[in-house]
A protein has these predicted regions:
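Short glycine-enriched, charge-decorated loop/helix-capping segments at active-site entrances
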Residues: 20-24, 186, 230
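Short secondary-structure capping/turn micro-motifs that flank functional sites
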Residues: 51-52, 77-78, 154, 179, ...
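Short polar catalytic/cofactor-binding loops
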Residues: 10-15
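Conserved phosphate-binding/catalytic region of the ribokinase-like
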Residues: 1-5, 188-295
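Substrate-binding N-lobe of the ribokinase-like
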Residues: 5-6, 17-82, 86-90, 97-101, ...
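N-terminal phosphate-binding loop and adjacent alpha-helix
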Residues: 52, 56, 184-186, 278
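A generic structural signal for short
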Residues: 19-21, 45-46, 122-123, 149-150, ...
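Ribokinase/PfkB-type carbohydrate-kinase core domain
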Residues: 2-7, 60-63, 68-72, 87-223, ...
Length: 295
């Protein structure tokens, strides 16, 4: 039994592109993938269909050294897919309904297991079955909760999101999502501080794409980080998930917030030079593991 483990709850799915290409992803899956590469051995809790795509996800996890005992198999609903369309170079996403990850089953409490952090997004809250499973998981949780907001119309409701934000200590969202969820103040920093106070958070992080990220804390900190100028960007898919994975590392290892933010930006900047949301080459992670003493 691993105690003080990071639990990651939510969707594992495939993005289907117009050319027929299928790319494994889902924000929680991507985060768990990075954490595994960083020697954190996360507990990934999700559900896939009894189908070929589900088999691919399970095998990919096994090949990466990830535990699969909490990857459930649904006999009725398919492995999650997202139809990606490209219009004038901009991607659009059709997140299909009634996917296996909507039906994550509540599990029997394991009284010996202790999670240091539970990470989850907001997409997995769209269905009552998965939401109830998450409620059961967090009800007995004594550590921290990290929510990675992902507002995808029509799959979110403001009041539901607010209820979950009130249960969290750390929250990450992007600048557009902040505008949807927080009353606008004179400055972004003021808006962030109001949001932090309203939901009783310890840390609020706002990502701003190519402009980097900002954080405010209950301790009064305000931090900005920016990416380097000369990045050879392959694509930005999964940059936020890479950022979140390192934020979780910072929580787990007690890094100062400034250092955590700098390291998260550094890793996200490295990831966008690669195609796709995950990297299947451990040598990509080695410089970070060595520099951050993660062995």
């Amino acid at each position: 039994m691993i105690n003080n483990q990071i639990a990651v709850f939510g969707e594992a799915l495939f993005d289907r592109f117009p050319d027929g290409q299928q790319i494994l992803g889902g924000a929680p899956f991507n985060v768990a993938w990075h954490l595994q590469a960083f020697n954190q051995h996360p507990c990934f809790i999700s559900r896939v269909g009894n189908d070929a795509l589900g088999d691919k996800i399970r095998q990919a996890m096994l090949d990466w050294g990830m535990a699969v005992e909490n990857l459930q198999t649904d006999p009725d609903y398919p492995t999650g897919t997202v139809q990606v369309t490209i219009n004038n170079g901009d991607p659009g996403y059709d997140i299909l309904a009634e996917q296996a990850y909507d039906f994550i089953a509540a599990q029997q409490p394991d009284v010996d297991r202790r999670y240091s952090v539970i990470y989850h997004g907001t997409l997995a809250l769209r269905n009552r079955t998965s939401e109830q499973a998450l409620r059961n998981l967090t009800a007995r949780h004594q550590g921290k909760v990290f929510i990675d907001v992902n507002l995808r119309a029509p799959w979110w409701h403001k009041e539901t999101v607010y209820q979950w934000l009130d249960k969290a200590q750390w929250v990450k969202l992007n600048d557009d999502e902040l505008m949807h969820l927080a009353p606008q103040q004179n400055t972004v920093q003021d808006t962030m501080r109001l949001f932090l106070a309203r939901h009783g958070l310890e840390v609020l992080l706002v990502t701003c794409g190519s402009r980097g990220a900002m954080a405010v804390s209950q301790a009064g900190e305000y931090i900005e980080v920016v990416p380097v100028d000369d990045l050879a960007i392959a694509d930005t898919v999964g940059a936020g998930d890479a950022f979140a994975a390192v934020l979780l590392l910072g929580m787990q290892h007690g890094w100062p917030l400034q250092l955590t933010m700098e390291r998260a930006q550094s890793f996200a900047s490295a990831l966008v030079t690669k195609r796709g949301a995950t990297v299947q080459d451990l040598s990509f992670y080695r410089p970070f593991i060595d520099a951050w003493n993660l062995d």
